[in-house]
Amino acid sequence: MLHRSSFRRLLTAAALASAAIAFPAAAENSKGFKLSDPTGDDKGPGTYTYPTDAVYKPGSFDITDFEVVPGANQTEFRVTVRTRIEDPWDSPAWGGNGFSVQMAFIHIDTDHKKASGVQDGLPGTNVRFSEDEAWDRVVIISPQGATRVNSEVGLKAAQWKDKIIVPKVTRAQGKTLIAVVDNAQLGGPPQTTWGYQVLMQSNEGFPDKKDLLTRKVNEFEGQHRFGGGSDYDNDPHVMDILVPPDGDPAKKQYEILSKYKKDTKEP
């Protein structure tokens, strides 16, 4: 169990909002840290629903734990969800990593300095970070193979390619997504001052021309579309994020991801 006094900073992604609040995040020790997230909050701003196809099992996008395990030359990131991770679309057949529907973005703020990082989320997430919590690195955990992910980054996020990390190893084990990253890509081994935020999304093999392999959220759910959002494409395309453990974490998440202009094409 983590104690509040030992928590590290947690970045709070605000959906197309001008500011986000800084919170402590994860506990420090010689082996890294583990942060738990409440269950049952895989609803984005509180209204989102899963696609209707049976492959999107309840809990598939519900983060329960985030863990960072540093090593001498590489770091392992682990994102655990509420249900066992499966591979219904046979990812090895298309060069994938052994799972199909989940995708996670791990944002890292290494300095907490204004204007030193990126405030915008990756294309298709529709989120924005506050100026003093802009991310300096982001690790993409995708079922798509590295060649496909790097190609998408080059086409849709080339301006940030030096900050985007495609892991050397991506795999799933039980309920956990695992990414192994060279510390050199992070700018060095993880530090106790770093801040983190994880966005849980869904892998879309046929994304919108501007979206980086992300699945859209519409007003009504469909076979392969989340529902409960907006068809104007200005809502956050995020099912779950990390929130601080004090108070009502789910309520805080819903507030954060509700900060967008509804029923309009304007952000």
Regions found by a protein language model. Name each.
Residues 81-83, 110, 173, 183-185, ...:
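Short, flexible loop/turn elements at secondary-structure junctions
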Residues 22-28:
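Bacterial Sec-dependent signal peptides at the C-terminal "C-region" and cleavage site
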Residues 2-12:
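Bacterial N-terminal signal peptides that target proteins for export
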Residues 63-65, 72-76, 101-105, 164-178, ...:
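Extracellular structured ligand-interaction cores
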Residues 28-36, 110-124, 187-267:
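Acidic/polar low-complexity flexible segments
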Residues 29, 50-142:
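Surface-exposed, glycine/proline- and aromatic-rich loop segments on solvent-exposed faces
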Residues 13-22:
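Bacterial N-terminal signal peptides
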Residues 137-194:
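Short helix-loop boundary/capping segments
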